[in-house]
Structures are given as C-alpha cells and as structure tokens.
Amino acid sequence: MLKEGGLRVAVIDADRIAQGVSGHTTAKITSQHHLIYHYLLNKFGQDNAQIYAHANQRALSQMRSWITAKNIDCDFTEASAYIFAESEADVDALRQEVDAAQALNLPASFTTETELPFPIKGAVCFTDQAQFHPRKYLLALAREIDGDGCHIFENTRALSVSEQSRCTVHTATGAAISARDVIIASHFPITDIGPFSARLTPKRHYAIGVVVDEKPVENMYISAEEPIHSIRTYETDTENILLVMGESHRTGEVIHTETHYQRLIDYAQSHFGARDVRYRWSSQDLQSVDKVPYIGRFSPTSRHQYTATGFRAWGITHATVAASILADLIQGKDSPWHKLYTPARIKPVTSAKEFVKHNIHAAKHLIRDRLKKREEGVESLTPGEGKLIKVNNQNVAAYKDENGNVFTVSATCTHLGCIVSWNSAEKSWDCSCHGSRFAPDGTVIHSPAVKPLKKV
C-alpha cells in the first residue's frame, strides 16, 4: 500500500519472508474470530464493534481483490466459517454471537446442520469467507514490493530503533537504516520496555496435518468449547490432509509440550478417523488485555514509530486491517478504524481483570523463578533433555544433545530478565513473560529478545 502510494519502502526480516508465524497458520481469511462480537458490543459499544466487523470484512474483500488482480496462485477457495458446539451448554453463547453479528451486518446465521462427521448441538455460520496457502500469498506480495527503489532485506535482525526527526533502525550486522517512518511488526515490539510489556500475553498454538481417506469438510470450523480446535482441509496431489490446530497455552508454561501434539492426534482420530501424521508444527501469537489488536503509533510521544500487534491468532485479516490503518497514518490521512485499534486507547473496565492477571503472572516469573531450588550440575541430564540447574548460585539453562554434547547458557531472558523454561517438543528455551524463545545454544528464535542467552 505504501509503495502504491509513491513511497520508498524497505522491509527487513530477521529470517526469511514467510518462514515464521505468518507462514504457519491454518490460513482462514475470515471476519469470524471465534466468540468475539457479543463481547465487543458489551465492552466496546455498537460503534466500535461495527468498526471491528467492517474492518475485517473489508480486509477479506481487499485480499480477494489483490489475489484476483495480481493473479496470485495461492490455493484461494471460497468457504464458510463455522463455530460449532458439541455441548448443549454452549448453544446459548452461539445464539448470542449470531444476534451480535447480525446486528453488525455480518453474514451470520445459526444452524444445527454441518458437514462435520460427528453430532453437534449448534453452530454459527459466516458465509462468503475464504481460505488459502499463506506462504504462497506472502511470497507473491513480497515480489510486488522489491524493485523501483523499494527493497527487502532478509536475514537482517533489527536490534533497536531510535527516533528524532527521522528514525534509525540499528541491525545486528552493524548496518543502520535511516527512514522517516518505521513500522515495528515483530509480534511483541522489540523496542518496548513499558506499556506493551504489561498489555500483551504470549500464547503457543499447536497444529498437525493428518491423512484422511476422504475429504471430511469443505468449509472451516472452530470449536466453541475449550480446548479450542480449529479445523480445515488441504489437498495435495495424492492425499487429503486434515489440519487441526489448538491445545493453546501461555508460552513457557508447559515443559512437556509433546502431550499437546498427542491430544490433537487423539482428537483427529476420534472425530475424523485420521491415520498418519504428515506434518506437525507450533506457532505463537499475542493477545491484548482487551482482545483487540494494537495498531497505530507506538506511543503517544512517537511521531514516526508505528506498531501492529496482539492479533489473538486472527492475523490473516487483521494484518490487512493494520496495513490499511498504518498506510493512512503515514501518508497523513484519517483512518476511520484507528480510534478502536489505537495503542493509546484506555479501556479500564474492559481490560482491568486481564491486565492485573497478566502482570501478577509476569511478576511471579520475574521474582519467584529466581528463588527456586534447583539441582546443581549436569550429571542427571539425559540425551535430548533440557533442564534448569544452579551453577555458583546462578540459574543456568542446560541441554544435552543426542551426541552427549552439553550446552549451558544463562536462564535469564535478555529481554526483561524473566527466567526461561524448557519446551520439550520444540527443544527451545521459552520465556513466559513476553514470549521470547531461544535455541538450546541460546540463539534467538523469537522476539522480543534480540540478544542471545549468555554463554555459561
């Protein structure tokens, strides 16, 4: 959007384009974001709820238009999006959601009939939604950016951003990029040392791709009940693949993460008769304390730094919403959606409970985890195991690989100093406070940390 507006743009990525979270989603292009609209009407009022609904419906239309106009081959298909309930206890919530969505002019209806191969008590149906292959789509857009004075720099990690009359992005290579405006779209803003730390919760989500004999569904589904399961299908040249995502938890809260994959496999087998597991992966996203993303100027004092974060696992349409809002602001235009999404908003009644809960949690990990008793030495480590130990009264993250090599690094996250914990399935050190993740040798996998864990 900025390039089309005549601006020169540079995109920098610590890894490769579409290698991270955006390339590993279930890729539903929909304004149906689970049970959200009844909540928005109650907490934000009619006008703001209407903004959320319209913005995401408009994002769906915009993406459909881009894919058609640019002839992007990304397996785009039209589909309906359903929230379903297997329990009678959740039906009232579904009916409330339908009423709210219809009041906001969304294409919603209640039904008791779906193509799911198991009985349900009811479902919310949004028609005229879509699904696609996110990586194919993102790489096509990236090709549109590069050229005519615009650039993409991959494998370039930003360390910090300074702002005066212009902004300077400082990178890990020592190079610096000067720009009038900078958008920090690193999930958790890498430059934040204050407001976002208290208002964003990192969540991990798990996904599997399993083989099914026949394609069980044409549309997209998500369960109303906890644990939430998100469902869609994908066809290869030779197989029908059922994608199931769910079993979410706060980052760094679970050590034996392998159990979450097994629960997804059990669900796919019991509900769909799934066979072999072809793919498995995990992803991460952030949730704001009031469930609405933060999109706009980084802080009230920032003139040229912007951010987009807190998508609550609904980043496909919200990324396009963010692009529209930020393109308008940077070009000096009014954005009709900004008043809802602005990071400067204050909704004390809406978010107070989650705000307190989040910050008690962070404080617990910042203080209590430092004082825990831990065994000393690495003698008890088995191959493939990671464990927190004490060395000279310091918390150390120790890992033994399959060849018996031991890696020891500081257990103190380089972002804001919380203690990391071991993730057995991904073999990583994860920070529960703000979502940073590190490889066994301390290398940064996921921001907001930009520096590795110190070697010990």
Language-model features, listed with the residues they occupy:
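Glycine-rich active-site loop/strand segments that organize a redox cofactor
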Residues: 24-55
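Flavin-dependent oxidoreductases
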Residues: 160-234, 373-379
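Glycine-rich FAD pyrophosphate-binding loop
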Residues: 3-24
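C-terminal catalytic lobe of FAD-dependent flavoproteins
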Residues: 225-226, 250-355, 409
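Rieske [2Fe-2S] iron-sulfur-binding domain
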Residues: 208, 388-456
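Flavin (FAD/FMN) cofactor-binding and adjacent substrate-gating region
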Residues: 35-41, 65-140
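A non-catalytic, amphipathic alpha-helix used as a structural packing/dimerization or gating element
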Residues: 51-65, 96, 263, 267
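Helical element adjacent to the flavin cofactor pocket in flavoenzyme catalytic cores
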Residues: 92-93, 99-104, 123-181
